[in-house]
Amino acid sequence: MKVYLVGGAVRDSLLNLPIKDRDWVIVGGTKEILLKKNFQQVGKDFPVFLHPETHEEYSLARKERKSGRGYTGFHTEFSSDVTLEEDLIRRDLTINAIAQDENGNYIDPFQGRKDLNLRLLRHVSESFTEDPLRILRTARFAANLMHLGFHIDKDTMILMCKMVKKNELLYLTKNRIWNETEKAFKTLNPHVYFQILHACKALNFIFPEIFFLYERRTFFSILFTNFYSISFLSIGLSKISTLTKDVSIRFSYLCQFLSEKIDFSSTKENYDDDSAKLVKKLCKRCNIPSHIEELAVLNTGFCVFLSSIHYQSSSNIIKMFSKIDAWRKPDRIYKLSFLCDFNLFYHQNKIDNSKLKTGFLKKCFFIIKDISVKKILNQGFKGYQIKNELNKLRVNKLKFWRMKKKCFFFKE
């Protein structure tokens, strides 16, 4: 029985990147042998075992035969006769099909180390086409390794296009799609993920709303040269990803481009309900976690309002705080404030940013968040009067602070 380190750990080690997880393949082993060594079996589709001390994953070498459609349509064989090369050939990319033995020697039958040096994402074999999830994985690897100069091999891209054309993507589950997309959003260049999906014609199947951004760029670039330019979106998504690792903020930034009512001269409250519903529909369809969905919907709905936050009345700002339930969920304010600041100072040709201060939305909330209801109750207010009086106190306190700090750009 021989044990080999495989996959991402070998790849990342060769690239001098931090190793997140170490996965192992066992050749010549059996389920019975591992259980006797106190390994814990997990996984339903094929035997994966957790090491009794390190809890790292060990898999029996296996080979696969296509038996149906989609990523689940496989017959898997994991007998002790399966060779290491038979296990490696079923993997997606050559850079993920490198093994290392206990002495540090590399087993690399598909030239993965050469492709690492060439900065090339290349499929291992024609069996790449048997699993549609590999389209998303390859796009995600392109995003994850872009800063190192990696690109997708042209023949691999041709295979990806053929897979899309055969409607293989229809067999992917919502959770699988989001899991890969979330990983892509955690990379340094998440925009590359969407660019690759668009290039291989997969974006329309998976995210038709985002696909529309690419398709409408020609018309809207005439009206909104910077904001609706897809290159502007990509650069912005890349830039904001250098400032925060929060997936909900990165995703919300992308979704705001779905708003069709962006107008940097507007001073109305103007909640964009249609665009907010579009984002909500996207999130529901893809089973996107609720905390990410909520921020994306709010940021898109209030995109117009937030783009002119310094010019809004104190009354309208308080109304917005109430609508987003800021009193019970203050974390929303901090994230929306981050997005607001980024948008205002990134769109420098739209607003005279020399007049504006960062963190304005957050400061407004901080000024009025601790106004107590007890004082209002002690004054004898009842029922609906309590809410009205509390709102009045908040508005007046915010007005006073803004006058003192000269944070008005219009007459209230």
From Swiss-Prot:
Q: Which residues bind CTP?
A: 8, 11, 91, 137, 140
Q: Name one GO biological process term.
A: RNA repair
Record-linked SUPFAM superfamilies: Nucleotidyltransferase (SSF81301), Poly A polymerase C-terminal region-like (SSF81891)
Name a GO molecular-function annotation: ATP binding
Give the first-level EC class, as a single word.
transferase
Reactions mediated catalytically: a tRNA precursor + 2 CTP + ATP = a tRNA with a 3' CCA end + 3 diphosphate; a tRNA with a 3' CCA end + 2 CTP + ATP = a tRNA with a 3' CCACCA end + 3 diphosphate
Q: Which residues bind ATP?
A: 8, 11, 91, 137, 140
The organism's place on the tree of life at top rank: Bacteria
- Alphabetized Pfam families for the sequence: PolyA_pol, PolyA_pol_RNAbd
EC numbers: 2.7.7.72
Q: Which cofactor does it need?
A: Mg(2+)
Alphabetically list the UniProt keywords.
ATP-binding, Magnesium, Metal-binding, Nucleotide-binding, Nucleotidyltransferase, RNA repair, RNA-binding, Transferase, tRNA processing
Q: Where is Mg(2+) annotated to bind?
A: 21, 23
The entry assigns this protein to a family as follows: Belongs to the tRNA nucleotidyltransferase/poly(A) polymerase family. Bacterial CCA-adding enzyme type 2 subfamily.
Function noted in UniProt? Catalyzes the addition and repair of the essential 3'-terminal CCA sequence in tRNAs without using a nucleic acid template. Adds these three nucleotides in the order of C, C, and A to the tRNA nucleotide-73, using CTP and ATP as substrates and producing inorganic pyrophosphate. tRNA 3'-terminal CCA addition is required both for tRNA processing and repair. Also involved in tRNA surveillance by mediating tandem CCA addition to generate a CCACCA at the 3' terminus of unstable tRNAs. While stable tRNAs receive only 3'-terminal CCA, unstable tRNAs are marked with CCACCA and rapidly degraded.
What does the miscellaneous comment read? A single active site specifically recognizes both ATP and CTP and is responsible for their addition.
HAMAP family hit by this protein = CCA_bact_type2
Q: Protein name, please?
A: CCA-adding enzyme
Provide the species name. Answer: Buchnera aphidicola subsp. Schizaphis graminum (strain Sg)
The coding gene here is cca
